[in-house]
């Protein structure tokens, strides 16, 4: 069973993990200020944010964790009824403050489609490596 990268518990991927790098809680004056220069509704800004804060920041994930997380995202994207906007609201027990205005994002599904496209592009070798393994042995 695949274990969490930092804890001795089973790893259960959650789409909110993709939002973790954008958590501005207690960092409003630094990270929050940096995010204020981007418009989350513009494709070019979204792509820059995803590359810098998810792709480049994903180094704490092993190739196996990346595969499981991307598979989970693919599953959600294949469900036409999945409400991606709910991921941007404060969930009980999930303490993440997203940048101002993100809860009003025009196309939350599009944001996650961009994440899927870019992670599959930039993590291609890791995802391929993991797909060649027997996941039941993890």
Task: Mark where each language-model region is.
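Alpha-helix boundary/N-cap detector
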Residues: 6, 10, 41-45, 64, ...
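Generic detector of well-ordered alpha-helical segments enriched in charged/polar residues
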Residues: 16-19, 47-51, 55, 70, ...
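Generic surface-pattern signal
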Residues: 20-27, 55, 59, 75-78, ...
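Amphipathic alpha-helical interaction modules
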Residues: 28-81, 85
């Amino acid at each position: 069973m695949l274990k969490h990268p930092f804890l001795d518990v089973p790893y259960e991927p959650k789409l909110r993990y993709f939002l973790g790098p954008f958590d501005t809680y207690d960092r409003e004056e630094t990270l929050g200020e940096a995010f204020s220069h981007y418009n989350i509704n513009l494709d070019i800004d979204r792509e820059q944010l995803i590359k810098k804060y998810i792709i480049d920041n994903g180094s704490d994930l092993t190739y196996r964790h990346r595969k499981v997380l991307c598979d989970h995202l693919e599953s959600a994207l294949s469900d036409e009824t999945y409400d991606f906007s709910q991921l941007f609201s404060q969930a009980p027990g999930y303490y993440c403050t997203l940048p101002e205005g993100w809860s009003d994002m025009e196309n939350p599904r599009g944001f996650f489609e961009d994440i899927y496209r870019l992670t599959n592009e930039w993590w291609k070798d890791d995802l391929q490596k993991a797909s060649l393994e027997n996941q039941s042995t993890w």
